[in-house]
C-alpha cells in the first residue's frame, strides 16, 4: 500500500525543516520496530521516522519505505544472486535500502549514513553501481520535498527553475551534479 503525500499548498521551493517533513508524512496506526535480526546501525532520525510511517510516495522518484517494506526489500536484496559475483554477506550487510523511485531503481545508504542511488539498468548490485549523492537521510528528505513542491507547482518557468536550483544548492552545493535522473528538461 502506497500513500501519496497530500500537503496543503506549499510555498514554492522552500527547504522543509525536519518538523515540517515529519508532520507531512502519513503516520502508521502501529509503530513498527526494527526486527531483531537486523544488525544495520541506523541514524536516529531514520529509525524515528520509518518505524512510525507507512510507505509514502513523496514524488514518483522519491518513495520512502516504512519499516515493514524496507525490511522486506532488504531481506530480498540480501540474496547473493542480486550482487556482483564474489560479494560477501558482510559487504551486503553494509547497505540498507530505504526507498525506491517507482521504476525499479533503489535508494540506499551505507553504514556512514551517506545516501546512494542504484539504477537497476546497471544489473548487479555493488558499490561501483551505486551513485553517491553526497547527502544524508535528512537532506534526501529535503530534496524529495523540494521536487514535490516543484512538480506540484505545475509552473516550469525559467524563474522557477532558477529558484529550484538555488534551493538544491543550499542542501548541498554539488547536489545538482549528483542527481541520478536527467533533470535537464526541468532544471
What are these regions (language model features)?
Residues 6-107, 173-187:
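A surface-exposed partner-binding patch
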Residues 10-13, 17, 34, 129, ...:
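Non-membrane alpha-helical secondary structure
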Residues 56-166:
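Long, low-complexity, intrinsically disordered segments enriched in glycines and aromatic residues
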